[in-house]
């Protein structure tokens, strides 16, 4: 796909792989911002704010016109789960998700430097985990896979066997709702025709 200078404001290899799978050309310029939720902030508002913040921060660091930022959380019984702090936190998260439906919420923002505005959206996907045995959780944690993933799991990797079903976008659970992102890029003129 043709593009007009797209910059991905994320170091996530999964997000890069998803964009590459759609044939989108882009550069990676990770942007670090404070990811702590504001007191009383709703989950959708939180991921949208972070996504836009990352996109705008990348625009301060790099040349380009379109800056794509994203943030993903797992939401279970009102708790916002980001990336686990350590093995104990990963175990706590996976125990909480065990046998319980939860939501993966990804906010994405495309900041257009020329128009000085952003398209911001959030996509929700419902995920159903099977009941996990302690041994499964500990074995998965031992792989090191949970530590850079919201909710301590990667549906496309070692945690695939934990997921019974999903309702909604699979790529959203991976970290970027590709269908919606490509549509938004096309609408704002970042992909040509």
Swiss-Prot record:
Entry-linked InterPro entries: ITPase-like_fam (IPR029001), Maf-like (IPR003697)
Cited CDD domains: Maf (cd00555)
Catalytic activity: dTTP + H2O = dTMP + diphosphate + H(+); UTP + H2O = UMP + diphosphate + H(+)
Enzyme Commission identifier(s): 3.6.1.9
One GO cellular component term: cytoplasm
Main location (coarse class): cytoplasm
Domain of life: Bacteria
Subcellular location: Cytoplasm
One of the record's GO molecular function terms: dTTP diphosphatase activity
Site entry: Important for substrate specificity: 14, 72, 156
Listed cofactors: a divalent metal cation
Top-level class of the enzyme under EC nomenclature: hydrolase
Any Pfam family: Maf
UniProt keyword annotations, A-Z: Cytoplasm, Hydrolase, Nucleotide metabolism
GO biological process: nucleotide metabolic process
Location of the active site: 71 (proton acceptor)
Described purpose of this protein according to its UniProt entry: Nucleoside triphosphate pyrophosphatase that hydrolyzes dTTP and UTP. May have a dual role in cell division arrest and in preventing the incorporation of modified nucleotides into cellular nucleic acids.
Family: Belongs to the Maf family. YhdE subfamily.
Entries under HAMAP family matching the protein: Maf
NCBIfam families assigned to the protein according to its UniProt record, in alphabetical order: maf, PRK14368.1
Protein name, UniProt field: dTTP/UTP pyrophosphatase
Organism, as annotated: Citrifermentans bemidjiense (strain ATCC BAA-1014 / DSM 16622 / JCM 12645 / Bem) (Geobacter bemidjiensis)
């Amino acid at each position: 796909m043709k593009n007009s200078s797209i910059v991905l404001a994320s170091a996530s290899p999964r997000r890069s792989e998803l964009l590459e799978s759609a044939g989108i050309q882009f550069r990676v310029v990770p942007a670090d911002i404070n990811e702590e939720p504001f007191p009383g902030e709703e989950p959708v508002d939180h991921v949208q704010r972070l996504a836009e913040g990352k996109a705008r921060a990348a625009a301060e660091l790099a040349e380009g016109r379109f800056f794509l930022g994203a943030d993903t959380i797992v939401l279970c019984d009102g708790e916002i789960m980001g990336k686990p702090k350590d093995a104990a936190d990963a175990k706590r998260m996976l125990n909480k998700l065990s046998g319980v439906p939860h939501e993966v919420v990804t906010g994405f923002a495309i900041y257009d430097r020329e128009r000085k505005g952003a398209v911001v959206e959030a996509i929700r996907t419902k995920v159903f985990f099977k009941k996990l045995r302690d041994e499964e959780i500990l074995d998965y944690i031992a792989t090191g896979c949970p530590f850079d993933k919201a909710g301590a799991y990667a549906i496309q990797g070692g945690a695939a066997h934990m997921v019974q079903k999903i309702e909604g976008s699979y790529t959203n659970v991976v970290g970027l709702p590709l269908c919606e992102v490509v549509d938004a890029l096309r609408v704002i003129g970042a992909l040509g025709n």
